């Protein structure tokens, strides 16, 4: 029998199969070499069973079937009488996968790509796929300009037919663009055209967007930008004939040549609109109106199409089709646009669903909706819902999509997918602040209390100059119409001298309540009443304080410290505007507020205060990682009825929340102390004690940039910026004629300037802000403070 097998093997030398030429009935099937794969599993994958009459073709199919499982490197089928002997060599099992040297590609991305190719821990290793994986990864590096990159798969055998798989990367450096040539341009210079490219052969220091590192994707984007540049200026026949990318022998340099044909400029003769316009032909005609002699403009054509889709989308036509076919007349150099419109079906909203709101109740999200269930789908209302959810500040991001309801021709579901952020915190700790010294803090705050959207806070702070406690509650939807109700109780013991202010102590407590009324999507009004008790003591003879005390009927002595108690009832009113795209770390939109406060009859003081705050975000690039931020804060207050506004209600500037680079509250008028005879105390006056003023103006210009060396996972919780701050505080009641030798504190032109960098982090304990700023313009008595940081909220 052994001789028979040997003879058959020699006759069929080179084949992986040894069997007789005639068919036979299989009596038994035996496997040799199985380790990980069970016999039963192997038998299930075979087309041959015990008792079958098999032919040569059946046995060949058996080999192919076993190979197809991916479990075996080698398969042989032998015949021993009527028995089949299947000899296999199993592929090794992958015990681990590691990566080395990959700086441009993350491990997670590599694992996903390997799994897509069937390479994962615990699975059999198909060595034939490794070369294609190596080549695919190298092709990726070539596409980003790293032509010296190599990828090598290293397989290390382990006991029990296992292996370790390690991908070793040698990335090298990106090839630098040496020259970009545009051939065939006559209407525009190469410099003008290349100015719109991201890839450049010469990058000026001020151009933060340009790059000399070659990337295939960026080149494709630049070619599209070149095409759009010509099409937007009437060159309807513009074509890019060819693009050559040449590599230097050392693979370190790139030469790019772009061959173009400009053609002639064409004018728009008119727009011919046809098709199903769902009864909105008049509106569509207005959107497609062109001026006589107007140049053909590709961007305008795209804008027309988008505006038509938006128009139809507002009225429930969720999936309109707009096709534009330009008819080019080369003789007259004119273009007629033939636009065919199919509005499609009008869709109604069956359901609005929310996904990802594990904490926030559905009702909290649903009340922000402007799209109603059962009504036709309105694209504007759907987008407004997304904007309003983002504006709540409860979510890191919000996405929305419309899903067609299967089996219906005119129904959709609107699905909002949210990712919640941590809106609450409990903390007890000890910290240090540049403005407050040693600080003890305990607090519980929840901006989305139990998922209801209510804001509940209990906070306390103890530092060198302040002991503060507060309990507050705000219900943003006190009524179903969006009327908000807020209330606050507070206690504050403030030692001004320790805060670099003039000497006095104020122990105050009070409460207030506020109602807010929405006017429209972006505007709201508020009104409120409040009570505050102020207990002033340890007031040293000082011009601003003595001036106030005399206005309220007190006659303080210049030789001793004064005290005074005041009970005030206040009415507040305000207007607010908000169209920011997000509740935290906005990237677009504006926010502004105008607020006023006035004392009511029965108060010991008679004064009013007005403040205006605004901030506007202007994104520079499409993905909004580069943003310009402008901020303004204005304030003015004064007394009436012969009384002055209390000095402790003065405006201050300087510090991390105002003009950075200056010490907190240090900008503006300084304390003028008096001797016992009423003259100016020259020894104490001219120091650094700030008293503030009844008028203030602060402005800031900031460039928000991507945070370097930070992964995308943390990009949404970090923000980096460079800034320039300016601010001034002045006293309109200052009498310069009385104190001619002192600075004129009534001047608004004593503006301080600073410039620096800032880093903000939305930490689990609250916002953490670091800044480093250098004063550019300062005055005598100003204190600078280059490095500043702030944790959480300030009062």
From Swiss-Prot:
Cellular component GO terms, alphabetical: Bam protein complex
Known PROSITE patterns for this protein? POTRA
User: Where found?
Assistant: Cell outer membrane
Q: Which UniProt keywords apply?
A: Cell outer membrane, Membrane, Repeat, Signal, Transmembrane, Transmembrane beta strand
UniProt superkingdom: Bacteria
Annotated InterPro entries: Bac_surfAg_D15, BamA/TamA_POTRA, D15-like, OM_assembly_BamA, POTRA
Membrane-spanning ranges: none
Biological process per Gene Ontology, one example term: Gram-negative-bacterium-type cell outer membrane assembly
First and last residue of the signal peptide: 1-20
Q: Show where the POTRA domain sits.
A: 24-91, 92-172, 175-263, 266-344, 347-421
Explain the purpose of this protein.
Part of the outer membrane protein assembly complex, which is involved in assembly and insertion of beta-barrel proteins into the outer membrane. Constitutes, with BamD, the core component of the assembly machinery.
What HAMAP family does this protein map onto?
Answer: OM_assembly_BamA (MF_01430)
Alphabetized PANTHER family for the sequence? OUTER MEMBRANE PROTEIN ASSEMBLY FACTOR BAMA, SORTING AND ASSEMBLY MACHINERY SAMM50 PROTEIN FAMILY MEMBER
Similarity section:
Belongs to the BamA family.
Q: How does it assemble?
A: Part of the Bam complex, which is composed of the outer membrane protein BamA, and four lipoproteins BamB, BamC, BamD and BamE.
Q: What name goes with this protein?
A: Outer membrane protein assembly factor BamA
Q: Which organism is it from?
A: Edwardsiella ictaluri (strain 93-146)
């Amino acid at each position: 029998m052994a001789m028979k097998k040997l003879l058959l093997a020699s006759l069929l030398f080179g084949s992986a199969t040894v069997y007789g030429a005639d068919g036979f009935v299989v009596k038994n099937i035996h496997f040799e070499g199985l380790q990980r794969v069970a016999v039963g599993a192997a038998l299930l994958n075979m087309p041959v069973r015990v008792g079958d009459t098999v032919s040569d073709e059946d046995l060949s199919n058996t080999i192919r079937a076993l190979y197809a499982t991916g479990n075996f490197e080698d398969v042989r089928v032998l015949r021993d009488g009527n028995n089949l002997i299947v000899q296999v060599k199993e592929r090794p099992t992958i015990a681990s996968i590691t990566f080395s040297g990959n700086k441009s590609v993350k491990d997670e991305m590599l694992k996903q790509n390997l799994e897509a190719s069937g390479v994962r821990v615990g699975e059999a290793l198909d060595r034939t796929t490794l070369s294609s994986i190596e080549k695919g990864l190298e092709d990726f590096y070539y596409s980003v300009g790293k032509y010296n990159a190599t990828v090598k798969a290293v397989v290390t055998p382990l006991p029990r037919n296992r292996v370790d798989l390690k991908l070793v990367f040698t990335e090298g450096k990106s090839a630098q663009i040496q020259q970009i040539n545009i051939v065939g341009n006559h209407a525009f210079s190469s410099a003008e055209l290349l100015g719109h490219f991201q890839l450049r052969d010469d990058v000026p220091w001020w151009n933060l967007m340009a790059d000399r590192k070659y990337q295939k994707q960026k080149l494709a984007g630049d070619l599209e930008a070149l095409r759009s540049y010509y099409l937007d200026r009437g060159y309807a026949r513009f074509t890019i004939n060819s693009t050559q990318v040449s590599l230097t022998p050392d693979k370190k340099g790139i030469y790019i040549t772009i061959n173009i044909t400009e053609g002639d400029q064409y004018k728009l003769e008119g727009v011919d609109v046809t098709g199903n316009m769902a009864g909105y032909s008049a509106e569509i005609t207005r959107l497609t109106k062109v001026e006589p002699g107007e140049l053909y403009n590709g961007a305008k054509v795209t804008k027309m199409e988008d505006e038509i889709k938006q128009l139809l989308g507002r009225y429930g036509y969720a999936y309109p089709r707009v096709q534009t076919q330009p008819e080019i007349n080369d003789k007259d150099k004119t273009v007629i646009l033939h636009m065919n419109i199919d509005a499609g079906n009008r869709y109604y909203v069956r359901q609005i669903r929310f996904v990802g709101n594990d904490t926030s109740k559905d009702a909290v999200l649903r009340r922000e909706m402007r799209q109603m269930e059962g009504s036709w789908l309105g694209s504007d209302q759907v987008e407004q819902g997304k904007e309003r959810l983002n504006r709540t500040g409860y979510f890191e991001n919000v996405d929305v999509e419309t899903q067609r309801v299967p089996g219906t021709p005119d129904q959709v579901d609107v699905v909002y997918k949210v990712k919640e952020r941590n809106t609450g915190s409990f903390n007890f700790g000890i910290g240090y602040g540049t403005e407050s010294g040693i600080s003890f803090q305990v607090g519980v705050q929840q901006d989305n209390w139990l998922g209801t959207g209510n804001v509940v806070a209990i906070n306390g702070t103890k530092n060198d100059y302040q002991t503060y406690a507060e309990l507050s509650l705000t219900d943003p939807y006190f009524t179903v119409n969006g009327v908000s109700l807020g209330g606050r109780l507070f206690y504050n013991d403030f030692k001004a001298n320790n805060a670099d202010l003039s000497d006095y102590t104020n122990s105050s407590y009070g409460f207030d309540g506020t109602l807010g009324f929405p006017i429209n999507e972006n505007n709201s009004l508020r009104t409120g009443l409040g009570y505050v008790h102020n207990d002033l003591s340890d007031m040293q003879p000082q011009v601003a304080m003595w001036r106030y005390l005399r206005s309220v009927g007190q006659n303080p002595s210049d030789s001793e410290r004064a005290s005074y108690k005041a009970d005030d009832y206040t009415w507040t009113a305000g207007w607010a505007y908000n169209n920011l795209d997000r509740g935290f770390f906005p990237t677009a939109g504006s926010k502004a507020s105008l607020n006023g406060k006035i004392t009511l009859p029965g108060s010991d003081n008679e004064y009013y205060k007005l403040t205006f705050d605004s901030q506007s975000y202007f994104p520079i690039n499409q993905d909004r990682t580069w943003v310009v931020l402008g901020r303004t804060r204005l304030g003015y207050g004064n007394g009436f009825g012969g009384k002055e506004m209390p000095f402790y209600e003065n405006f201050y500037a300087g510090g991390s929340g105002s003009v950075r680079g200056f010490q907190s509250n240090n900008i503006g008028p300084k304390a003028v102390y008096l001797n016992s005879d009423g003259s100016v105390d020259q020894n104490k006056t001219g120091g650094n004690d700030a008293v503030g003023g009844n008028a203030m103006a602060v402005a800031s210009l900031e460039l928000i940039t991507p945070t370097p060396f930070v992964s995308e996972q943390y990009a949404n919780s970090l923000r980096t910026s460079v800034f320039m701050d300016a601010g001034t505080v002045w006293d309109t009641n200052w009498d310069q004629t009385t104190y001619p030798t002192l600075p004129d504190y009534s001047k608004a032109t004593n503006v301080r300037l600073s410039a620096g960098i800032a880093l903000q982090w939305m930490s689990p304990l609250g916002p953490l802000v670091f800044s480093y700023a250098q004063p550019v313009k300062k005055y005598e008595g100003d204190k600078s403070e280059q490095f500043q940081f702030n944790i959480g909220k300030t009062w």
